[in-house]
């Protein structure tokens, strides 16, 4: 029987605009873009030229430090642009999809007949290794370092998060094959929600299943690692999102890559929130067109409101994202008395407004305003109330700001990723950019230690 872990700390932010449990058709996008910045820790080296034809699964760029780690095209077509920024930094590579799709063939493989080294080689050749991240540092995994374990979180507790069970429908065999492949490399842990009932999750084979019950961030893989098998200095673990596990299963079962995700289109400004099928890097114009509020300043996000990336209405789906969100920008809002005005429709963790009297099921419409400037850091334990990890978050943040590596190590920086502090950032009365601070701290530590 699966182990049950109940979390008492956390906070659910109930927003308006949850996706209906249906998959709607959208016009196939004509362009796909990969951004190296989506793959944290990678120094890209472009291996294609503009106007060159690539097949789906063909490499677009590799990691300079580990050339065996390839980042491949999700579709076949012509490379229309290689965009560079300051100091020739590679910003993005765009491919115009061909009418007829051609695939790099990697050959169907029986996972049972392979060992861990052969599985890893297959993932590297097909570009799927790029979707595996490692702790410490929360970067694309180093293929030369053997992981102690691999963690998969099969549920998401972020605001308006997609239901993985809907995405899993019809992909059960591919998901199990993906788990089988990962289990060949290292012991694999699968974390599921107490509300998930799919046999593909509750009865998954070759993995250790753990059931979590709690508020957000219970779905964060970092929180799960902290409660199952914490990361110590000198240890490495891998993490991978569940839809990328499906990618792996498709590779072994079909012999070619298929980066199609089931994506939730959410947010208070989406007219018909629902699910769509999109490949990684897809142009999103057709998704938002005639499906968002008009005559209003909007914030488009690839991902969720806490950890997602701001994009334009003509942006692209992020490599690791299975959610799109549209909320009001808030730049055109003028409120009498500002934030001190009594109200029933604004969310507050400290009951500053009367909205808490409306019950936990009330759906809120929140905009992108910070509503305040950065202030001195207040040691009020407000982070502790929403972070169910065995660390001292406020002291860790102070150690990162001070650049004290010894203190950072002692306070648990090897276990965390920026997303683990997203909720802390939301409730922070000092308005500090905690995710950026943690990212800077991890980068500094990696430069010193690697």
Predicted regions and their residues:
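N-terminal, Lys/Arg-enriched amphipathic/low-complexity engagement segments
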Residues: 1-47, 62, 212
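Buried, small/hydrophobic-residue-enriched core segments of structured protein domains
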Residues: 69, 83-450
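Active-site-adjacent bridging/hinge elements
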Residues: 31, 51-54, 149-151
